[in-house]
């Protein structure tokens, strides 16, 4: 059976007991936004800022003693969530953070595989969020 990766992610969250997601929609996470919003096992709360999503997930875990997920878009969406992610990490509060990503073949990193041009940007509003969060996350 074929399934979209975004639907697999939503089903994975539900199968691991996640019932609540805090999100800000964005183009780089549009398939995730769609899958999370249509999954009957998930309640998605949309916020106005990514930092609010991370802080809401932290508060949710503190109050309900259960993990919540956060879904943000690429680039600035991921970096906007960092303050809340660090806060949760410092206090050992569990959160499941998902950051969208545009198609690899549309990024500058893909183009750089064919040239030696020293660009620091990965593409239009793209940023290597994995390197930034590696010191404040478990996985």
Mark where each language-model region is:
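N-terminal alpha/beta PP-like core and its mobile active-site loop of ThDP/TPP-dependent enzymes
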Residues: 1-139
